[in-house]
Amino acid sequence: MAKTSAVEKNKRRRKLVANHSAKRAALKATIMNQSLPIEERFKATLKLAELPRDGSKTRIRNRCEVTGRPRAYYRKLRMSRIALRELGNLGKVPGVVKSSW
């Protein structure tokens, strides 16, 4: 089980990304627009720097929904390989069967 603080921090980051994504995208578009004067683009850069760092999408870490484990994460199932194996053996993941040949 992952530390509760790490899981909660990641949840807080997801909320910040949801709140600031539109504003960040608008500022980035302004910064990348070559037709605008350099002063206006620089002001947009300063405003972007004032936004919280945790509001950036790259700060989010994919974590297992069951255990909170950050590594060996399957995106489709939103869980780690360990949780997948445990729940798969119990028959709680639809379509997962133990292989035999």
Curated annotation (Swiss-Prot):
Gene Ontology biological process terms from the UniProt entry: translation
Classification via InterPro entries: Ribosomal_uS14, Ribosomal_uS14_bac/plastid, Ribosomal_uS14_CS
Record's keyword annotation contains Endoplasmic reticulum: no
Biased composition (Basic residues): 10-20
Pfam families assigned to the protein according to its UniProt record, in alphabetical order: Ribosomal_S14
GO cellular component, one term: small ribosomal subunit
Keyword rRNA-binding: yes
Positions of region (Disordered): 1-20
Recorded superkingdom: Bacteria
Keywords: Ribonucleoprotein, Ribosomal protein, RNA-binding, rRNA-binding
Record-level Gene Ontology MF annotations: rRNA binding; structural constituent of ribosome
Disulfide bond entries: none
Biological function: Binds 16S rRNA, required for the assembly of 30S particles and may also be responsible for determining the conformation of the 16S rRNA at the A site.
NCBIfam families assigned to the protein according to its UniProt record, in alphabetical order: PRK08881.1
PANTHER family: 30S RIBOSOMAL PROTEIN S14, SMALL RIBOSOMAL SUBUNIT PROTEIN US14M
Family: Belongs to the universal ribosomal protein uS14 family.
Known partners and oligomeric status: Part of the 30S ribosomal subunit. Contacts proteins S3 and S10.
Name listed for the protein in its UniProt record: Small ribosomal subunit protein uS14
Organism in which the protein naturally occurs: Sinorhizobium medicae (strain WSM419) (Ensifer medicae)
